[in-house]
């Protein structure tokens, strides 16, 4: 029997502070719940949307009920008895961090049980010897930034100086990351990528999870804008991924859409598709759902929920993007094949109503749809790896070292 798996990951779409949220300073965070509350109270109205949060297709997969189980309250405006077609769970993270890589790796069987390296100082964030080595090896004459910053704010603040000097902008955040912003045309994309590759080699011994190239365009602070040519340089996963097992045991196709390939350092990926906007990510995903061969795993990361709305603390923008995604989700559902398993999940939270600009430690929704799957609550998962283990079960692969299977199909005992 030819099967496919389609994973739609809404980057940062948490559904309530997890039991260890206090350890991360995230008590009270609830990405979905607080967006729904703002919408319900007309605090997220804009030219693009208004009123309660309307996500009928996600509700049908069990989103509201999953959030109810996770946070002990139904998101405002959601139905207690939706027309349920999906099976739903919620999951806590086993990994020691609340970043993109930890969440993604864990769900494919490689939880991060070690500590990443971090740059904790808000200013003068990077050790001088590291900066000196980067300058020496890449022949750059100087740099700007060297601090914690929002990526969109720092190009506003330092972009004009960057154009004068052509010094790259170095910055970080609460995540294990070293980010380099530079003008795509004046500094050059290839130059930026080469700089990031060199920085990645230098930083790898410090267990810095990612170096990210952040190209931008524009002529002044009023029109600087990041482009779609972001590139992530990630440490390779420390354990075998579900992808690799699928390729070895079933000769499967693993199709990355968006930044998935970069997150897994291109390990176990057989096809890659880039996309710039949320609309493009939806378009490419739908195209693959229609055309990808059987025996495929299609995996899309919808990054804009995190980068454009979560970190920027834009509640209305997040709500509008969710409603757009929900409408496009109907197209995906309508084009699934007989033996497709659809999974909808997240990798961490990033509550746009919360203090600061960082990720939030939250439970994630785990929503499944297959024509032979009984709509039901599947319980609380103690690790995101339950997602990968369920996929391994569905595809008939050797089990992962972490996680348990959540799926029980009609006709099974």
Swiss-Prot record:
Binding site for Mn(2+) 2: 306, 311, 359
Keyword line: Cytoplasm, Isomerase, Manganese, Metal-binding
Entry-linked CDD domains: PPM
Pathway linked to the protein: Carbohydrate degradation; 2-deoxy-D-ribose 1-phosphate degradation; D-glyceraldehyde 3-phosphate and acetaldehyde from 2-deoxy-alpha-D-ribose 1-phosphate: step 1/2
Binding site residues for Mn(2+) 1: 11, 347-348
UniProt remark on cofactor binding: Binds 2 manganese ions.
Principal localisation: cytoplasm
BP GO annotations: 2-deoxyribose 1-phosphate catabolic process; 5-phosphoribose 1-diphosphate biosynthetic process; metabolic compound salvage; nucleotide metabolic process
The EC number(s) this enzyme carries: 5.4.2.7
Localization annotation: Cytoplasm
Keyword flag Cell division: no
Cofactors required: Mn(2+)
A Gene Ontology cellular-component term: cytosol
Highest taxon listed in the record's lineage: Bacteria
Purpose of the protein: Isomerase that catalyzes the conversion of deoxy-ribose 1-phosphate (dRib-1-P) and ribose 1-phosphate (Rib-1-P) to deoxy-ribose 5-phosphate (dRib-5-P) and ribose 5-phosphate (Rib-5-P), respectively.
Entry protein name: Phosphopentomutase
Taxonomic lineage: Bacteria, Pseudomonadati, Campylobacterota, Epsilonproteobacteria, Campylobacterales
């Amino acid at each position: 029997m030819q099967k496919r798996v389609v994973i739609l990951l809404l980057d940062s779409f948490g559904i309530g502070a997890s039991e260890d949220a206090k350890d991360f300073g995230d008590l009270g965070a609830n990405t979905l719940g607080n967006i729904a509350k703002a919408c319900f109270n007309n605090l997220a109205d804009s030219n693009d949307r208004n009123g309660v949060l309307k996500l009928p297709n996600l509700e049908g997969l069990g989103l509201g009920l999953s959030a109810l189980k996770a946070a002990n309250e139904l998101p405002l405006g959601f139905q207690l008895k939706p027309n349920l077609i999906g099976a739903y769970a919620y999951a806590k993270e086993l990994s020691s961090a609340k970043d993109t890589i930890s969440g993604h790796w864990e769900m494919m069987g490689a939880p991060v049980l070690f500590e990443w390296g971090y740059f904790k100082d808000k200013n003068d964030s990077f050790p001088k010897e590291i900066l000196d080595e980067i300058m020496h090896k890449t022949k750059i004459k100087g740099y700007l930034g060297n601090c914690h910053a929002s990526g969109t704010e720092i190009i506003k603040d330092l972009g004009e100086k960057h154009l004068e000097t052509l010094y790259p902008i170095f910055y970080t955040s609460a995540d294990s990351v070293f980010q380099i912003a530079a003008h795509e045309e004046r500094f050059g994309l290839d130059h930026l990528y080469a700089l990031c590759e060199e920085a990645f080699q230098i930083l790898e011994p410090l267990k810095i999870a990612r170096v990210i190239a952040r190209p931008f365009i524009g002529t002044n602070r009023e029109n600087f804008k990041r482009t779609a040519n972001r590139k992530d340089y990630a440490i390779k996963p420390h354990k075998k991924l579900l992808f690799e097992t699928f390729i070895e045991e079933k000769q499967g196709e693993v199709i990355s859409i968006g930044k998935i390939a970069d997150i897994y350092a291109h390990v176990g990926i057989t096809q890659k598709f880039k996309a710039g906007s949320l609309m493009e990510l939806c378009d490419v995903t739908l195209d693959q759902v229609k055309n990808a061969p059987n025996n495929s795993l299609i995996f899309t990361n919808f990054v804009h929920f995190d980068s454009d709305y979560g970190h920027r603390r834009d509640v209305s923008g997040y709500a509008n993007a969710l409603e757009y995604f929900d409408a496009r989700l109907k197209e995906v559902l309508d084009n699934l094949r007989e033996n497709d398993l659809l999974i909808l999940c997240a990798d961490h939270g990033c509550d746009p109503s919360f203090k600061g600009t960082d990720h939030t430690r939250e439970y994630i929704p785990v929503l499944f749809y297959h024509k032979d799957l009984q709509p039901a609550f599947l319980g609380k998962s103690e690790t995101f790896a339950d997602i990968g283990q369920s996929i391994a079960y569905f595809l008939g692969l050797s089990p992962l070292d972490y996680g348990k299977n959540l799926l029980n199909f009609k006709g099974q005992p």
